[in-house]
Amino acid sequence: LVGNAPGGAGLECQFSGPTLRFQRDAVVAVTGADMAPELDGMPAPMWRSFTVRAGQTLALGFARLGARSYLAIAGGINTPPVLGSRATFHQAGIGGMEGHALKKGQAVPVAESADGAEGRAGRQVIAARRPPLTGEKNWQIEVVPGPNDDWIDEAGHARFLSSDWLLQ
């Protein structure tokens, strides 16, 4: 949506998002869980690239449906790759923004877009191509047998696979 190269870094926001004040003009896109993005307190689009001007504030709230939103900024977040990835691995303290989640007041380094991003505003993912996000709470998940699945007899496997489960 913003024209970044494959492997360009963005922000993954789990359950709630940040409030970001932009120091320069940028083209951004928010996808994934609906975190009701707002630009200077007004609703901002999801699944569509749009321009944020220097001094404006983009805020992502709490996820209404889904768990994770993704914020892409034209040019990409400019962090060094670690083990071939720009992702943050919190438990190991590596990658991303010095191995930790963003902190209040921390500047996010954004690379310059190679060919200027202004013309990319307005691109969108059509509704038919977006993953379905519904309030449905009954999910069918796949099970992969583990290395000790032979500890359970055939009747136990059948009972496990035919039962309804409540995840808490």
Predicted regions located by residue number:
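Conserved "landmark" site that anchors the functional core of diverse proteins
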Residues: 1-168
